[in-house]
């Protein structure tokens, strides 16, 4: 292992000083055991693997940084992360959660997808497990009082952001192709509500099985739908709306073979933003770059740049690409969980632990910014960055092309790293 550099230590101190001054830890209330164990359900394989792999690295850094911090303040405790691969599969996620439960784990970071969260929710709710997903955004999972917390805002805001962009781009009708699960259907619902309210049209969504690996029939239907619309609208007024996980790369790789869908713009969604598989596929990345494909995702807080900047650099050095924002929300979730245990001890009942977690989240300002939760246990604040693929001399890279402020409803274009209203 390389020696810790002064710059690294400075970054860690900066990351937590602003939070620590607000925290009220009880000196006489040490955890009942020196090792605090936290579970992590990650999509290390399957269609969510791009996010899972970057999150695995980020929470590994969280464990390192936490233990260094605990040692620096003389605290007789350490954190240990137990990581399980859900394979981006609902049944596997539940299986692994039950294993964690039998191991005495009562705080779990993850899983990645809303479908997985939905699958494990009944068990978590009835067995006193707090689940903190860094990435689940389905609107229907915004439920007050349950044991599911989420470190991102629900897709209500994503629907607003996408609709704003579509209207400003003069798109009048969208033809969705979506993953047929709770996330895909909820996101389509949120976007449809906002887009139709702005005068837009949603035309004949094409839905596919989340386990599908070939998309010939879906692309044929999508192409036929666009062909029908071309009798009424110009190509510049029509867009394909892709709501996918990593399988979107396979869809884009084949899309160029269909004459009508390649004549219109494409728009993406949060689960595909910054996806690592897209840049590795020549056909898919070329199609994405030439057809726009802006993908909105929970945005970075500029006021937290001194925190997410160094962390992003560390993750990038480890995985060879820029991480998505969910790696940062996962990192922060581990920290808030640890600080909650320092406040409550490890034997607190679930109601006490949830209340303390909510308080700690409200007082924490980390790599992803302010982590205050709303009444549903979801992130209370959230702007969106739009990422799209752009070509440079070394290949294709994800770059921010626009930002949406949920408080003001303003969409700001980003051109050559300059904000343009």
Regions found by a protein language model. Give the residues of each.
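C-terminal motif of bacterial Sec signal peptides marking the signal peptidase cleavage site
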Residues: 15-18
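Bacterial signal peptide processing site
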Residues: 20-24
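Beta-alpha junction/loop-to-helix N-cap segments that form part of ligand/metal-binding clefts
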Residues: 25-26, 31, 37, 50-57, ...
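Periplasmic-binding protein-like
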Residues: 40, 100-113, 132-134, 175-178, ...
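Short, solvent-exposed amphipathic alpha-helices that sit
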Residues: 51-69, 92, 158, 182-202, ...
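Extracellular/periplasmic Venus flytrap/periplasmic-binding protein
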Residues: 138-140, 144-257, 301-306, 310
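Extracellular/periplasmic periplasmic-binding protein-like sensory domains
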Residues: 252-331, 344, 411-420
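Segments of small-molecule ligand-sensing domains
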Residues: 314-328, 338-400
